[in-house]
Amino acid sequence: MNFRLVFKLTGKTLLVEAGALLLPLLVCLFYRENPLPFLLSIAMTGAVGLALSLIRSNDHFFPREGFFAVALIWLLMSAFGALPFFFSGFFPSYVDCFFESVSGFTTTGASVLTAVEPLPRGILFWRSFMHWMGGMGVLILTIALLPSLGGRTLHVMRAESPGPIVSKLVPKTSQSSKILYGIYCALTLLEVFCLRIAGMPWYDSLVHSFATAGTGGFSTRNLSIAAYESPAIEVIITLFMLVFSINFALYFLLLCGKVRQALRSDELRFFLAVVAFSTLLISINIWPMYPADGSAVRHAAFQVGSIISTTGFASTDFNLWPEFSRILLVLLMFIGACAGSTGGAIKCSRVPQSGRRLVVHLRDDSRDGV
């Protein structure tokens, strides 16, 4: 095991995190909030990151180093990412801060907080920005910004990415990372502007776009998206939750003009079919609960998109929905988004693959029985 190279890569990733902490620091300064929690966090994270990145090492890097680096980096990223929460004084203990940080970077969206609106804007910004960093993968961001492992970066990408198959979009892995994050940034900015046009303030548009892009679900409001009471905002976020649930390699194909090849994706067709069919079933099931103005369809589509993408936003209290709709949402939670997206769960591609393998297995067993 090449520990020196792993520690060096860890140090560079912590330097990226220290740089990312500058953004919420600017938010604090803009809104005239106390910047000390972020100043201390930047100093501590940067110092440890610099010390580790200066370690001398050889270039021997194999898959086992990739998996170990991913595990160590996610642990340390979460530990240092919790520092602003701890120094802010709004969390009772560092354990709670660490929980919030892990939830942010892993885009889980669970929180120890019962009310988020009293928190400073800088802290709320950092909570959602952790979603954005963790959604595509912190290490993929590091590779894009600081390519230093040459062709061996593919080991890191494979260890970092949760989908069944990880391949390079172009021959150079670092270039693939830049393409992925370029698409990621472009889609995020597009959502920011769409939400702003729909009437959401700039700050809220940024925070909710980060959470949508990372499919995490942290919000600036206690009632999540339901607090805005805006059909336009709900429709926009519904669309972007689905957009970020699709394999980013397909967007690359679209950019290359290979539209037919992108649309021939079996996983994409299965994903869209599941979304459409689930929305239809839930809409019919909850139709009597809402006015006859299409609200049932809007809320059904929003919650289907929120659950299957594992984002976790809410436009209404779906605990009040009939049991059939709630069970269907739970099933969607297990299916999840497409491979190569920022969404979670077992990935949509595995469902038809498992089904085909099961059919083949049963067919072979029946032949053996005959």
Predicted regions: what is each one?
Residues M1-V370:
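Membrane-proximal intracellular helices of multi-pass ion channels
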